[in-house]
Amino acid sequence: MGFTEKQEALVNSSWELFKQNPSYSVLFYTIILKKAPAAKGMFSFLKDSAEVVDSPKLQAHAEKVFGMVHDSAIQLRASGEVVLGDVTLGAIHIQKGVIDPHFVVVKEALLDTIKEASGEKWSEELSTAWEIAYEGLASAIKKAMN
């Protein structure tokens, strides 16, 4: 079974909730660094600070990550596959030293952040929709890394 219309709608509505509050971007990176402190150096906007500090670069990067997962949901619904809009993503991830466990950390942080943003609208169905969309994106990035 492919990505359903309902799953796409769930991702769309929670994406809108995420975008409404910039503090979710800080939460996202705080969770990443709690789970994988060594990842701090991978992000130019985090490596020189003692803790996660809000900044335009942090906001832009978080919105890009969540936006790409959102776009992946749309692509999965439309065609059943994710095609990267930015062909340099594979090379960037190689350059930063990203390995498989990092994708797991980001997925967990993304799901925790969406859970927080969704509040009472959170459900297993919503979590599954984001997880499938993220896995589609992660798979496309890993493919571009090879």
From Swiss-Prot:
Domain Globin: from-to ranges: 2-146
Binding-site residues, heme b: S44, K64, H93, K96
Domain of life: Eukaryota
This protein's record includes keyword Ribosomal protein: no
Modification sites for Nitrated tyrosine: Y24, Y29, Y134
Role according to the record: Leghemoglobin that reversibly binds oxygen O(2) through a pentacoordinated heme iron. In root nodules, facilitates the diffusion of oxygen to the bacteroids while preventing the bacterial nitrogenase from being inactivated by buffering dioxygen, nitric oxide and carbon monoxide, and promoting the formation of reactive oxygen species (ROS, e.g. H(2)O(2)). This role is essential for symbiotic nitrogen fixation (SNF).
Protein name: Leghemoglobin Lb120-8
Organism: Pisum sativum
